[in-house]
Amino acid sequence: MTNRFLILFSVTIVSVLSSAAQIPITFKNNWMYVDASFSYGDKSFPISAMIDTGCTYCVIDSTFAVDSCGITPQNPDYNGYNTSRDRTRIFYTTIPILCVGGKEFTEVKCAIIDLSGKFQTNHRFIIGADILSKELWKFNLKSCILECLDKNSSLSYKSIITWDKRSALFYNGIVLKAKVNGKKAFFLFDTGSRYNQLPKEVGILPTDTIVKEFANIATPIVWKNRERVQAAQFSLSSINLPIDFLLTNESIGYLNVEFLLDRAFIIDYTKKRVLLVE
């Protein structure tokens, strides 16, 4: 009886720990958000954090950081770049502990940026590639669940997306080579990008023009008239589907998470690959 109780107790504990590591994902404007928390001083702050593979470090909104958290910015003379290569001044701080899905990350470097003033959204915190690269993360976009996997576990998957050898603008950036309407194109996998964008140099003609709002860490929100390719046939590994693209003058385009909706995938920074589970 005692042994049976211990076995049942162990199974219950494992089940609880496993479920605790699963975090619900919510979507807004093609952006993914998860619940997290961080500590600063003697206080803990719960946050809804956006997941951004196109951002090197974590980011905290400046108003929230200073007024609500009492954070003092450091390194005010650091000059940084956004994904569009616009230069901007960035302040940094170090967060003692960041908790995401039952995982604790210590001494987290964090940029302090006016997110609400530039993006006109409720972004308070962004989880960047610095944190994402430290673990194996499984994104199940069918059930909208994020899970941190054991690095030593056996991974089951159906196909692989290998990162291209081209260097991204920033450390831990993910560059993918795909085909659009049968033509080769390179993209930065940027879950923080609101739109999918295709380089004009690929040679695909636009189907129409549309007015869209744009913003980044260097510039506030503006409205732009942009050429668009509607329902372009996108192919990458085992993925084949129509996607709308805005055209860009940059040599590398942008892919947000849209091409992975209704799928489950694992981002493996160590082996530079994305594993398609479903």
Protein language model annotation of sequence segments:
Residues 1-24:
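Bacterial Sec-dependent N-terminal signal peptides
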Residues 20-278:
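Pepsin/retropepsin-fold aspartyl endopeptidases
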